[in-house]
């Protein structure tokens, strides 16, 4: 049996503390702050602004999603979501784009994305105005869309891209 003087053992323990912190911080989730916004219930809702691989001009959108940062490394990502609307319920759903050159499957009669077919990875469900929620998901490298799937909102431009790198 090897005997270490108490002071030497204490010195080793203190020296190891920064390493323990590095391990836990390396495994911590990336935090993304998300704002769900709109220009008010009295604004006429824009249409035809859903994600399109060819590009779409979101400057006409009357509602949207802002995420910062817009990228993260693969692994755990925590989305802190706030509904900044004064009078409209919104939600945030994380959708994986298996092929970013294709639009999400849209159910026109219901004015929403088919979440099951689209690759739903998790959501912060229907937040009342001013409310917040969080979601932590493990994401692989690729392109994702953050969308609001309340009927009509996605087509009104309520989405943003989110990229996960290696």
Q: PLM features: what roles do these ranges have?
A:
Residues 2-12:
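Bacterial N-terminal signal peptides that target proteins for export
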Residues 4-5, 24-27:
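Serine/threonine-biased, Pro/acidic-interspersed low-complexity stretches characteristic
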Residues 15-18, 144:
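N-terminal secretory/membrane targeting signals
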Residues 17-25:
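C-terminal segment of classical bacterial N-terminal signal peptides
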Residues 29-76:
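N-terminal edge beta-strand
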Residues 30-31, 66-96, 134-147:
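Beta-strand cores of secreted/periplasmic/IMS beta-sandwich domains, seen most often
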Residues 32-33, 38-40, 86-87, 119-166:
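Extracellular/periplasmic metallocenter environments
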Residues 90-126:
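The feature marks short-to-medium sequence segments in extracytoplasmic or secretory-pathway proteins
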């Amino acid at each position: 049996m090897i005997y270490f003087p108490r002071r030497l053992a204490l010195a080793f323990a203190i020296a190891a503390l920064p390493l323990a912190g590095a391990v836990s911080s390396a495994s911590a989730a990336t935090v993304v702050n998300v704002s769900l916004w709109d220009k008010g219930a009295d604004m006429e809702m824009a249409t035809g602004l859903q994600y399109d691989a060819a590009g779409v001009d979101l400057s006409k959108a009357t509602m949207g999603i802002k995420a910062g940062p817009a990228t993260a490394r693969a692994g755990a990502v925590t989305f802190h979501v706030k509904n900044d609307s004064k009078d409209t319920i919104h939600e945030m759903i994380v959708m994986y784009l298996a092929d970013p050159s294709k639009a999400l499957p849209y159910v026109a009669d219901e004015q929403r994305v088919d979440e099951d077919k689209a690759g739903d990875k998790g959501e912060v469900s229907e937040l009342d105005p001013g409310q917040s929620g969080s979601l932590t998901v493990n994401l692989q490298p690729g392109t994702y869309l953050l969308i609001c799937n309340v009927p009509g909102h996605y087509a009104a431009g309520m989405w943003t891209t989110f990229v996960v790198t290696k």
